[in-house]
Amino acid sequence: KLFSFGNFLTVWRPMEKTVVLSKPDCVQKKIMGEVIKRFENQGFQVIGCKMMRLDEAILRDHYSHLTEFPFFSEILGFMQSSPILAIALEGEAIIQKVRDLIGPTDSTAAAKGTVRGDLGEDKMRNVVHASDAPEAAEAELKRFFDAGELMA
């Protein structure tokens, strides 16, 4: 399905795909199901889902914008402390809708009712990562999923 539309008053909008990573704190707290349920309750379509351990190479690629910061080694350690759950979602304007549902990076600043506001602890232990733009989503889909692993 390439496009969805409501009626003659709405504009055709392309379906988007995005990536959500349930981070180690999410896995360790056993709240992965709660996170997925929140996405499904919004009508988001899960098109891929897999547990994986992230090696240093994939993390350096994923967090390339942070490698020069002194806290980068802490990010590496945290993201390798347990497996993560990679989730691919599809829907209309899904990148922004997911960002709205999860809340800002800093869980202490996230509103109640958002994933991070309800379940996160701080900037690092904030339960999930989500693609922030179409270009990032495209790169992350390729980084975390092989072509045959997506059901759309």
Regions found by a protein language model. Give the residues of each.
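Non-catalytic terminal and connector segments of soluble metabolic enzymes
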Residues: 8-152
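Cationic, low-complexity basic patches in intrinsically disordered or flexible, solvent-exposed regions
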Residues: 2
